[in-house]
């Protein structure tokens, strides 16, 4: 098995699960105990990044290492778009996955990281199929629909996952001789367009992120066709993080069981405060 296939296979192992943002080892343990398949180590969760403004960068390596030492599940960490030096640092730390993330400030407005040069699998965001295929062509092993991180508002997440999946559906119905024109319109390599049309899905796993705050939110995007979810501020900005973490994990695993969803949604306390009017849209970064 080639390195690229190995990295894609590692990401496939997370399918059907929940990846949670954490800022301390104690939060990482809560996530692991709740059944998260991985954690994202950050100095600030997205809602705090949004509130504080300024330039947001890769987290302190010491924090990332403390989180890695505290749990047995995979640990991810974020780098700025285009900042391959930050990615080199994370690879040296032996993180399990690197997220080239629009939640952080953009380091290079012209180029994303060439992820094929790394042994660590990368996660990248996308709002549409063209964006997703361009990131895969650069070596991304997992795509997450962007949504709007740190808002608690699911609207952009549903918009983006629907856009990606509807464009894939349209590809599967296209004639072979139409695919080169589709590839040009998408701004994506023809070989990836052909593979996606043949598979009827992306050649890598597709998670949803940005605005997931309740078990029902998680069920919604899973029913729409997501392979799993990232939950950032929705856990540790809620009234009862342990309860929300466990409930969202259960809702993701059994997303089509309405009786279970009703049961795990009871008596959770207040969900994270939401933000609907945005001056800064993270999802517009790094298209």
Swiss-Prot record:
Protein family (similarity comment) = Belongs to the PdxS/SNZ family.
Q: What does this protein do?
A: Catalyzes the formation of pyridoxal 5'-phosphate from ribose 5-phosphate (RBP), glyceraldehyde 3-phosphate (G3P) and ammonia. The ammonia is provided by the PdxT subunit. Can also use ribulose 5-phosphate and dihydroxyacetone phosphate as substrates, resulting from enzyme-catalyzed isomerization of RBP and G3P, respectively.
SUPFAM superfamilies attached to this UniProt entry? Ribulose-phoshate binding barrel
Positions of the catalytic residues = 78 (schiff-base intermediate with d-ribose 5-phosphate)
**Assembly behavior:** In the presence of PdxT, forms a dodecamer of heterodimers.
Which terms does the UniProt entry file under GO BP?
A: amino acid metabolic process; pyridoxal phosphate biosynthetic process; pyridoxine biosynthetic process
The protein's matches in HAMAP family, at most eight in alphabetical order, are given as: PdxS (MF_01824)
User: Binding positions for D-ribose 5-phosphate?
Assistant: 21, 150, 211, 232-233
Reactions accelerated catalytically:
aldehydo-D-ribose 5-phosphate + D-glyceraldehyde 3-phosphate + L-glutamine = pyridoxal 5'-phosphate + L-glutamate + phosphate + 3 H2O + H(+)
Q: What is this protein called?
A: Pyridoxal 5'-phosphate synthase subunit PdxS
| EC assignment | 4.3.3.6
Pathway(s) the chain acts in: Cofactor biosynthesis; pyridoxal 5'-phosphate biosynthesis
Q: Which one of the record's GO molecular function terms can you name?
A: pyridoxal 5'-phosphate synthase (glutamine hydrolysing) activity
Query: Which residues does the annotation say bind D-glyceraldehyde 3-phosphate?
Result: 162
Q: Which InterPro entries match?
A: Aldolase_TIM (IPR013785), PdxS/SNZ (IPR001852), PdxS/SNZ_N (IPR033755), RibuloseP-bd_barrel (IPR011060)
Gene this chain is encoded by: pdxS
Q: List the disulfide bonds.
A: none
Identify the keywords attached in UniProt to this record, alphabetized: Lyase, Pyridoxal phosphate, Schiff base
């Amino acid at each position: 098995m080639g390195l690229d296939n190995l990295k894609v296979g590692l990401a496939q192992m997370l399918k059907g699960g929940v990846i949670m943002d954490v800022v301390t080892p104690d939060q990482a343990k809560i996530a692991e105990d709740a059944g998260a398949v991985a954690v994202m180590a950050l100095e600030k969760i997205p809602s705090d990044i949004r509130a504080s403004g300024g330039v947001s960068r890769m987290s302190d390596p010491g924090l990332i290492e403390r989180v890695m030492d505290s749990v047995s599940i995979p640990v991810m960490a974020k780098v700025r778009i285009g900042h391959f030096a930050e990615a080199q640092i994370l690879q040296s730390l032996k993180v399990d996955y690197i997220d080239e993330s629009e939640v952080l400030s953009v380091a290079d407005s012209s180029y994303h990281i060439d992820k094929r040069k790394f042994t660590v699998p990368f996660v990248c965001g996308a709002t549409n199929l063209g964006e997703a295929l361009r990131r895969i062509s650069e070596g991304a092993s997992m795509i997450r629909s962007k949504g709007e991180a740190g808002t608690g508002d699911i609207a952009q997440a549903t918009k983006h996952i629907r856009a990606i999946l509807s464009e894939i559906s349209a590809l599967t119905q296209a004639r072979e001789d139409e695919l080169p024109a589709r590839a040009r319109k998408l701004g994506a390599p023809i070989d990836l367009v052909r593979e996606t049309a043949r598979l009827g899905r992306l050649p890598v796993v597709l998670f949803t992120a940005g605005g997931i705050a309740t078990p029902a939110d998680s069920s919604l995007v899973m029913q729409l066709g997501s392979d799993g979810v990232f939950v950032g501020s929705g856990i540790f900005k809620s009234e009862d993080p342990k309860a929300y973490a466990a409930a969202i994990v259960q809702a993701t695993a059994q997303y089509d069981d309405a009786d279970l969803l009703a049961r795990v949604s009871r008596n959770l306390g207040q969900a994270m405060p939401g933000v609907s009017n945005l001056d800064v849209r993270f999802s517009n970064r790094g298209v």
